[in-house]
Amino acid sequence: VYVDSSVLIASIGNESYGEWARGVLAGKEAVSSAIAKVELARFVHWVGQLSDYLRPVISAVSFAKVDDQAIAAATAVSGEVKALDALHVGTWAHLKTVGVECPFITLDRKQAVAASRAGATVLHPFGDLS
């Protein structure tokens, strides 16, 4: 599965979607964009000492480079979502072009819509996205 930072962050703590995030990730191989490492580090700095919780999350995820192809794919959705969210969708789209077929998991409604429009099967807790 391709997992957005919002899901990784929720899986660490007791946020409202924490249980959902842990359940949807359980037993799955996960990949995310390398930018997720920065987003996770920012979260840790924001909430304090969570490094003991962060290490297992980071070690369970493969991180894909943000290369020119991912950036090019991100520009296609950059008008719909924030820049980092577009980079996640772009990274997923690039992975698809190199043969990695996987659903996109997010806790961001706008990003879910953008990923769906980009062709992803999107797992999210929101019900209908329309």
Predicted features by range, described:
Residues 3, 32, 65, 83-86, ...:
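Short beta-strand scaffold positions
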Residues 1-32, 43-56, 120, 126-130:
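Short, well-structured N-terminal submotif of metal-dependent ribonuclease cores
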Residues 20, 39, 73, 91, ...:
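Phosphate- and divalent-cation-binding pockets in alpha/beta enzyme and binding domains
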Residues 18, 37, 51-54, 71, ...:
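A general structural signal for well-ordered alpha-helical segments in protein cores
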Residues 33, 94-130:
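Acidic, PIN/NYN-like endoribonuclease modules and their adjacent C-terminal/linker elements
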Residues 27-30, 60-62, 98-103:
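Short active-site oxyanion
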Residues 59-95:
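Acidic catalytic patch
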